[in-house]
Amino acid sequence: MGVRHPPCSHRLLAVCALVSLATAALLGHILLHDFLLVPRELSGSSPVLEETHPAHQQGASRPGPRDAQAHPGRPRAVPTQCDVPPNSRFDCAPDKAITQEQCEARGCCYIPAKQGLQGAQMGQPWCFFPPSYPSYKLENLSSSEMGYTATLTRTTPTFFPKDILTLRLDVMMETENRLHFTIKDPANRRYEVPLETPHVHSRAPSPLYSVEFSEEPFGVIVRRQLDGRVLLNTTVAPLFFADQFLQLSTSLPSQYITGLAEHLSPLMLSTSWTRITLWNRDLAPTPGANLYGSHPFYLALEDGGSAHGVFLLNSNAMDVVLQPSPALSWRSTGGILDVYIFLGPEPKSVVQQYLDVVGYPFMPPYWGLGFHLCRWGYSSTAITRQVVENMTRAHFPLDVQWNDLDYMDSRRDFTFNKDGFRDFPAMVQELHQGGRRYMMIVDPAISSSGPAGSYRPYDEGLRRGVFITNETGQPLIGKVWPGSTAFPDFTNPTALAWWEDMVAEFHDQVPFDGMWIDMNEPSNFIRGSEDGCPNNELENPPYVPGVVGGTLQAATICASSHQFLSTHYNLHNLYGLTEAIASHRALVKARGTRPFVISRSTFAGHGRYAGHWTGDVWSSWEQLASSVPEILQFNLLGVPLVGADVCGFLGNTSEELCVRWTQLGAFYPFMRNHNSLLSLPQEPYSFSEPAQQAMRKALTLRYALLPHLYTLFHQAHVAGETVARPLFLEFPKDSSTWTVDHQLLWGEALLITPVLQAGKAEVTGYFPLGTWYDLQTVPVEALGSLPPPPAAPREPAIHSEGQWVTLPAPLDTINVHLRAGYIIPLQGPGLTTTESRQQPMALAVALTKGGEARGELFWDDGESLEVLERGAYTQVIFLARNNTIVNELVRVTSEGAGLQLQKVTVLGVATAPQQVLSNGVPVSNFTYSPDTKVLDICVSLLMGEQFLVSWC
């Protein structure tokens, strides 16, 4: 095959011509090098849905040769072309099982596999492409303002209908670390994901990558400039671009790949013939199944610890196939190929570069980081009030009380029943008076079965034309909790205004604080609609990904139903995201404060508007353990506000399981205990006193750490950082961290090692190079209103060379370690964040061997909008060096200026100090333990004023 380097700029055309002639004489094809250096001009943008006009629909008829169904002249593969290593074989029968004769009629090779890989989901293909299989040819490659353009032509049709034989390639060198290319039909506008991405006006002058093109068969090769490593090579298999089947394959530089959520799987995906299906579905987390969200982004680790990422901006139903060579194939059922490559080179940078495209996470209100409690079955305000009272009596923190469907009248949105919930508004007001917040479930499906004039949300929605329609132009009617239902089209601007009105009107009755949006894949209890679905190409595409149920209509609405921007075939995976955007905006309008939305269904960019909970998990040890990689995965995808239902949702928990889940859940960024209708009670107060004490201890620790957690969310919001993160993100050069997914970090500083198995009193975790201090030697409980747990002997520090360590983990303990070199702020825990925010604060200072450490505190009123734009916040940097701790005041306002610092705990003080000074004044109230090397200093300082604490 011929490989082309990008062409020259016009300024150097003459030089290039000489080079070209000489090279052509030797090689028979042209090699051109690009020397274009143009200053980069970027205009920032917010990744929000555009209001665009409908595009060409997949499945529509096309005139001319693209409709060709016969494939005359397709060459048969000869035996020598079929000598392809088994792990490098790309499937020539992705659509169905075929015979040898049918395979060879496609021009492909047929060799039955001797034995599949153990544990493989699919197995190697028997029918596979030979290297000579016809693909597209690159023509008219030229330089552009942003990079390169070219035409791609195919002369031989594929075995899928409606091949698009002429394509346009646009390569955009957007930034030094981001390459973007699209492949689309130049003659007909096709559906593109309506997610606004950054607008760039000129190519990057000094990219970290180089781009090469294979002429025939066409392919793109992307290398890392530093070492020449190939990050993307699409020449490994032929390109397909038919109306309803697009396939792009690439080699991978290693088998260590993560992303492509949402699935129940380890953090690192298996490359042993694994198929990952992206088509959002209401299904309790099950291995190998398509679940609630679709995120077509992966991060790949490379030898030495570098990393890169690839994002296919495509929302159609798709499969992603991983194979052992290693390689990956994208198989989409529509749209265009819109590909971003992020160069990193650090894994952390890859995540930030991805979020530069899809959007940084929203900043949650402070109360949203407290403990949330819910269950399906709180069937009255009396029962709900009793739950809150029981939590208070048992001295458990509780910030947000929730209700499931029970509050509704006939399970209809924006209503409450006048039996058990007749005093619903008063109950919510009482929660507010106690410093708590309230949330309830809101499903997207709107009841359509009542008589006209009986249910305003449907009547008004029908009048405004906000619902998804069927082929007759009438609202598509499915079945969900209230019975017959219509589905709002959140891509319709009219529907956004209608949703805002419905939210505001209900908020006028019941002053709720946040929205729990469920069933928004969208879920449907029947297949398609009450009238079925049409028999057309959108309902029966030539390629159906590996969806549970076997059809695109399974557990959802008809793919051919109509929305404002396009068909549901194209927009299905965006339904949860568009509802999250609508709910985010509606809460801002109704409440005038920071919105808090938790959604089940997600797509790329979701974290900018809402959080996520991982759905209907079972109360099992297996799903407890699986929650860790799930939480880590969503943080890598820019959705840091994520958690699983503590103690599990389906089935009955056990006391031990619920204790261990509460301990882990205390370190979910979003913590909610939620339970199913028929399951045994699992509120913390439902268990024995020893179990309650263990849970109380975990919740106490979470509340003490909330200032640090809030600061991490601020860093995520402004800089694209993760909150909970896998070890490899901080220690990428240590390959032992790459597969660790039963531990997690909070930011850079805290390492959490939970117990995830039954009957265990110890746990083994990996500790990267450095010193790790046991955080539970820091006694902060005395600062707040919660009783301190009983003291237990602890190993004060682990000095690791990068090793596995076995730790004691009795039932009342979760191991949390503070990394040397970091300072974290803590606060006295209360029963609510309203209470805890009034408590004095402490600093935990973890010194390196050189005696240094650094930390940060971000503080505002916890719920106002635009605090950064208005400067209504306090930000403080803490530094330790030479036996001295100081604070640097980045910004101080009334919010945070009066925060009291009452204690400084210094970990790793080698020798007993003779004197401690606070702002130059001797401190008499300090203690030092020669066994633990911990120095405790009682002070009386203000965070918002400069201070200096020293010892000698």
Swiss-Prot record:
Keyword Hydrolase on entry: yes
The entry's keywords: Disease variant, Disulfide bond, Glycogen storage disease, Glycoprotein, Glycosidase, Hydrolase, Lysosome, Membrane, Phosphoprotein, Signal
Effect of G607D: In POMPE; infantile form; severe; loss of activity
Gene Ontology annotations for the cellular component aspect, listed alphabetically: autolysosome lumen; azurophil granule membrane; extracellular exosome; ficolin-1-rich granule membrane; intracellular membrane-bounded organelle; lysosomal lumen; lysosomal membrane; lysosome
Effect of R224W: In POMPE; infantile; mild partial loss of activity
Effect of W516R: Loss of activity
Record annotation: effect of changing G293R: In POMPE; infantile form; severe; almost complete loss of activity
Effect of S619R: In POMPE; loss of function of the mutant enzyme
Impact upon substituting W402R: In POMPE; severe
Record has Hydrolase as a keyword: yes
EC number: 3.2.1.20
Effect of G309R: In POMPE; severe
One example GO MF annotation: carbohydrate binding
Primary localization: other
A Pfam family per the record: Trefoil
Propeptide, chain numbering: 28-69
Paired cysteines (S-S): C82-C109, C92-C108, C103-C127, C533-C558, C647-C658
Effect the entry attributes to changing C103G: In POMPE; infantile form; severe; loss of activity; shows enzyme localization primarily in the ER-Golgi compartment suggesting that mutation could affect the normal processing and stability of the enzyme
Effect of mutating P324L: In POMPE; uncertain significance
Region (Disordered): 47-82
Result of altering D518 to G/N/E: Loss of activity
Consequence recorded when altering L355P: In POMPE; infantile form; severe; loss of activity
Reported effect, R600H: In POMPE; infantile form
Disease with which this protein is associated in UniProt: Pompe disease: An autosomal recessive metabolic disorder with a broad clinical spectrum. The severe infantile form presents at birth with massive accumulation of glycogen in muscle, heart and liver. Cardiomyopathy and muscular hypotonia are the cardinal features of this form whose life expectancy is less than two years. The juvenile and adult forms present as limb-girdle muscular dystrophy beginning in the lower limbs. Final outcome depends on respiratory muscle failure.
Name this protein carries in UniProt: Lysosomal alpha-glucosidase
Organism: Homo sapiens
Organism ancestry: Eukaryota, Metazoa, Chordata, Craniata, Vertebrata
